[in-house]
Amino acid sequence: MDYRKESLRLHGEWKGKIEVNARAKVNDKDSLSLAYTPGVAQPCLAIKDDYKKSWELTRRWNMVAVITDGTAVLGLGDIGPEAGMPVMEGKCVLFKEFGDVDAFPLCVRTKDVDEFVETVYNISGSFGGINLEDISAPRCFEIEEKLKAKCDIPIFHDDQHGTAVVVSAALINATKLTGKKLSDCKAVINGSGAAGIAIAKLLMTLGLRDVILCDRTGAIYEGREKLNPSKEAIAKVTNREMTKGTLAEAVKGSDIFIGVSAPGVLTEEVIKTMNSDPVVLAMANPTPEIMPDEAKAAGAKIVGTGRSDFPNQINNVVAFPGIFRGALDVRASQITENMKIAAAYAIASLVDDDKLSVDYILPYAFDERIKDTVAKAVADAAVKDGVARI
């Protein structure tokens, strides 16, 4: 099937992938008066007296805004907010189908950080959570931090944290097969944007011994010239041996390669310089940093990609719906590091030890256990962290 042509045809047929359905049925005078005026005044007054009632008397408790400025849409780059709408609608479909979360797409026409933050903050009272999507780095870091400081609902940039959670789940299981502990492993992440930095942070929280991030220039280390603020910050807590040079030099002697970068940047020769039984997660789409057959021929024990036509797909859809489901269920005020870690372990747990193999380290996207398992783990972590409000 030519997915591009067929998708374009179907989008024209669908004329939008989501729609609004009424939960309150209005079919006579009484039902009209209850759903709208005059009856609707009573819940309005109740919320006026206590804004927290908005979670009980409206759909806010289950509503998430999926918000972009269109500056980093898929691999298409800065294509503008309107052009990002098909992706935002698609994300909303995934929220509903995989997490039973009602999500609404919002494409904001500004590249100014403060203007974007103010816009999102001003509408946040309508939602139980905010999912930031396809916002360019390093602006995405500043936007998320400012919104987290202003809002009393979860702010979650899925390109960062959803990816980090799934990669962490993959490595929790991969290390079972390699017989190595994360605390003994060194990883190299090629790509130091939103996903790469978030992956590094979460893996270090999980106990990874060390990680080297690389960009187009090569290894990132403290004191390297011309680093943006986000790279400067991550350089202070990574690459403890101050490795310098190219990607190939950084990868030598490592146990794990994680690619969130560009096609074909990793070669068989470079993989051969890694430690025994290396793990290669080559997630560039649609063409990975190295093809799975090439990586395995070079000695990789486990290979994952971002594609569904190869084993071990690293797909955020196994993470973000359940994470938000759990956060919404306990009316969490934020999504903490412990909630992300709980999600990673929950996802990993869905691959039974007797079924775990080099070609099966993550549950499949359509595994019906994912939503409830991840949601419960996240909700329990929220309670332990004191951010649950029910």
Residue ranges with predicted function:
Residues 1-155, 375, 381, 385-389:
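N-terminal ligand-binding/catalytic initiation module
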Residues 12, 55-60, 96-97, 122-124, ...:
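Solvent-exposed alpha-helices and their adjacent loops that cap or buttress functional pockets
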Residues 69-71, 79, 108-109, 134-137, ...:
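Short, ordered loop/turn segments at secondary-structure junctions
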Residues 74, 79-99, 151, 157, ...:
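Glycine-rich phosphate/diphosphate-binding loop of Rossmann-like nucleotide-binding domains
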Residues 105, 131-134, 155-158, 189, ...:
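General beta-strand structural signal in soluble alpha/beta enzymes
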Residues 158-159, 282-390:
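Adenosine-phosphate binding glycine-rich loop
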Residues 232-302, 307-309:
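Rossmann-like adenosine-cofactor binding region
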